[in-house]
Amino acid sequence: MRKAFYTWLMAQRHSTSNKPAALLADLVFEDTTFPKHTDDFETISRYLEEEASFAFNLGQFDQIWEDYLSH
């Protein structure tokens, strides 16, 4: 079983990085309603599109997701 996307994403946090995964990780870290226990693309993508309290380039999310799948 794959680890939750949130768990993987938190390992990408780097306060001095401008990489999209690090930026998303910082935003998600501050978001208390982010779905933390799932590895489902649709659930996370829908959350980012419709419910997140922050804006993020969803084109970059697709590449971050590919990186997550290849870890």
Curated annotation (Swiss-Prot):
Pfam families (alphabetical): YozE_SAM_like (PF06855)
Top-level taxon of the source organism: Bacteria
NCBIfam families xrefs: PRK13672.1
Family (UniProt): Belongs to the UPF0346 family.
Protein name: UPF0346 protein Sez_1447
Organism: Streptococcus equi subsp. zooepidemicus (strain MGCS10565)
Upper taxonomic lineage: Bacteria, Bacillati, Bacillota, Bacilli, Lactobacillales
